[in-house]
Amino acid sequence: MQQPIHFARASDGVTIAYSTSGNGHPLLLVPGWISHLELDLENPDYSQCIGALSQGGRRRLIRLDFRGTGLSDREVADTSVECRAWDIDAVVESLIDHTGFDSVAIFAWSMGGPAAIAYAAAHPERVSHLILHGTLAHSDEHGREALGKALVDLIRADWRIGSRAIVEFVNPNSDKEVADSFTYYARNSASGEVAAALLEEALFHVDVRGELQKLTMPTLVLHRRDDQAFPLHCGRDLASLLPHAHFLPLPGNAHAPFYGDFAPIVEAIGDFLATSDGHTHGAPGEQEPQTGAPAGGLQTLLFTDMESSTSLLSAGSYLPSPSFPTSGGQTYRQVEARNPLFAHHGRNPMRRSLAREWSQKEKCL
């Protein structure tokens, strides 16, 4: 993937590196703990996920390295959520200065989530859509205080061993080769002190709950059910506090979105960006049809734990026939006729999940 590297200056003078690729409406990828614009692309899982998100270059992807990591300024004194929100602001303003767009969609995961929330709350006019994966609004929610302190201390004491230990949370299914690659990547993406400071901030000092009601843009919250770093309830609790949120629990235990089966994540993001109301996702000047989005408030989208459902969804083969019966005794076609959310979301996993939820509600009427 060709990726020109650009640099923007944050409000406190820190230089932030970012890359651009593709065309269309910008989707800003806000990384988690640490990142490296060049080394990330050497990870085949990351590259495949990014390639799928880019839609063959039809979607403009913007990636950044937060301060203290990757190609951005490494020697920094402050890595707080507030400062990382400044980093996002610098990149977005630089992007707006060089394109015909006046807003971006944001996809943030893990520790990048609180910074994206803080930025979107301060600049809602700059964010068309907000997508959050595997993140939280308040550090107290993860319930891993003792383990978190041990990891922070280990990383500060020995970055090589500490980076190895963290693999179990980022990608629990790693074999030795993947674990070795991650250790090399981590140690070349940030110093041990910065890595420890970032982890400590995320695990003990994050609280953006006061910003959530300021988020007026459509928001999608994704969370894997068996996430080993931030448990599922972190995403559920976050979504419940957002005024315009969809919550989509997904199968899997990997924390980073590009590990494990990322096809449902890519598909959910594509569906969300395509169906959310009132925003343009092509080149400047192109208009999208108005789809009549549902009113504000949390909508929970349910995937059932059917055997092989993930592979079927990623293969695009799980398309029930119009007469396929739901547990409520109604057909998908009959549910579609009565459910306005169905029309909003199109024939995709989000739509099918809403149909199941609607049919269950009808059983209780």
Segments predicted by a language model, with ranges:
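Conserved HGGG/HGGXW glycine-rich cap/lid loop of the alpha/beta-hydrolase fold
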Residues: 10-73
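Conserved acidic catalytic loop of the alpha/beta-hydrolase fold
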Residues: 85-104
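Flexible "cap/lid" loop of the alpha/beta hydrolase fold
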Residues: 117, 121-122, 127-157
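Conserved alpha/beta-hydrolase catalytic His-Asp/Glu region
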Residues: 142, 160-206, 210-211
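Short beta-strand/loop motif that positions the catalytic acidic residue
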Residues: 215, 221-223
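Conserved alpha/beta-hydrolase "acid-adjacent" motif
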Residues: 228-234
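Catalytic active-site module of serine/aspartate enzymes centered on a nucleophile-bearing elbow/loop
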Residues: 245-288
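Catalytic NTP-binding/metal-coordinating core of nucleotidyl cyclase/transferase enzymes
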Residues: 286-365
